[in-house]
Design a protein with these regions (language model features):
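TPR/TPR-like (Sel1-like) alpha-helical repeat modules
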Residues: 172, 188-213
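Residue at a conserved register position within TPR or TPR-like alpha-solenoid repeats
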Residues: 145, 152-155, 191
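Long, contiguous interaction/recruitment modules in multidomain scaffold/adaptor proteins
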Residues: 1-144
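Helix-turn-helix repeat elements of alpha-solenoid scaffolds
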Residues: 120-124, 153-166
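Structural register within alpha-helical repeat arrays
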Residues: 148, 185-187
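Alpha-helical solenoid scaffolds that mediate protein-protein interactions
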Residues: 73-77, 171, 178, 207
Length: 213
């Protein structure tokens, strides 16, 4: 069973790194993905040892890493608003690790403890569904895209998939309309400086619709 845990860590790490390219600050989730890949690679080496790690070791490791990742991910999801990937992927590890530990102890638990363990497992799964829904399905980071646009503008990265133009084009939000004029103004100034009159006029009209400068 240890090999399955190793594969899960590697797949999760590679997926996070791949999806991080579509985040305003890709380095945040990339670091987490690299940590998962390192855990997986170390696990591959450990599985070939004379005494490979037990399932309980992997379950405990996933519970610890997943729990810590959920805390860090929720901070980014709700406070810094810089990343939406760490929390849901950490939740997967937390569910796999903690539910695995409960399953191994199921036979020696009393009836009351089994009920409590079942409620805990259901709570963890419900929390993971929320993290996936909140982070991967509806997670939007308009403020972070604006910040990333300003950072890339200072670095001189204007064009391209991760350039300032692309970032500001994503920095709008229906619920937080106060962010939209800043994005429109930045887009109007950048396109005007590049000599794209039609694009500049389009963003200028959007800016006027929001009340102007």
């Amino acid at each position: 069973m240890g090999l399955e845990h190793v594969l899960l860590a590697c797949i999760a790490g590679a997926t996070v790194i791949g999806m991080s390219k579509r985040q305003p600050f890709p380095e945040v989730s990339q670091r987490f993905g690299i940590v998962l890949l390192l855990i997986g690679l170390i696990g591959i080496l450990a599985q070939n040892a004379p005494e490979p790690p037990s399932d309980r070791f992997w379950q405990s490791a996933f519970t610890f890493v997943g729990g810590l990742g959920v805390v860090v991910g929720m901070r980014h999801l709700a406070y810094t608003r810089m990343d939406v990937l760490i929390a849901p992927f950490s939740g997967i590890l937390l569910c796999v690790g903690s539910i695995g530990l409960l399953w191994d102890e199921w036979g020696v638990l009393t009836e009351f403890e089994q009920i409590a363990a079942f409620i805990l497992a259901a709570f963890l799964c419900t929390g993971e569904v929320y993290l996936v829904f909140r982070g991967l399905l509806i997670g939007r980071l308009p403020q972070a895209w604006s910040q990333a646009g300003l950072r890339n503008l200072q670095r001189g990265l204007i064009d391209g998939p991760n350039g300032a133009l692309s970032c500001f084009e994503k920095a709008w939000d229906v619920e937080k309309e106060h962010l939209n004029p800043m994005a429109y103004l930045a887009l109007q100034r950048i396109t005007a400086a590049k000599g794209h009159a039609d694009e500049a006029n389009k963003w200028a009209e959007r800016l006027i619709e929001q009340g102007g400068e």
